[in-house]
Swiss-Prot record:
Coiled coil: none
A GO cellular component annotation in the UniProt record: cytoplasm
Domain of life: Bacteria
Single GO term (MF): structural constituent of ribosome
GO biological process entries: translation
Stated name of the protein: Small ribosomal subunit protein bS16
Family in the record: Belongs to the bacterial ribosomal protein bS16 family.
Species name: Shewanella sp. (strain W3-18-1)
HAMAP family (UniProt xref): Ribosomal_bS16
Entry keyword set: Ribonucleoprotein, Ribosomal protein
Length: 83
């Protein structure tokens, strides 16, 4: 099954997440199909917290990709920010 989920990056105690489309059988930070955005929970000042390609997310969801709970919330936040 294809899922849209977070893949952790960054350094120890400084998380940074790529939002990726991946096969659910692959490791969390392993092989992915496409990177559709990023999430930086520790962004400060003018740094961007969330960037998401909503068109590609819609494409994958329409083709049957499932989203994790956290990614679903981030998608909702991104839609609210663009509206």
């Amino acid at each position: 099954m294809v899922t849209i989920r977070l893949a952790r990056g960054g350094a120890k105690k400084r998380p940074f997440y790529n939002i990726v489309v991946a096969d659910s059988r692959n490791a969390r930070d392993g092989r992915f199909i496409e990177r559709v955005g990023f999430f930086n929970p520790l962004a400060r000042g003018q740094e961007e917290t969330l960037r998401l390609d909503l068109a590609r997310v819609e494409h994958w969801v329409s083709n049957g990709a499932a989203t994790t709970e956290r990614v679903a919330k981030l998608i909702k936040d991104a839609r609210k920010a663009t509206a």
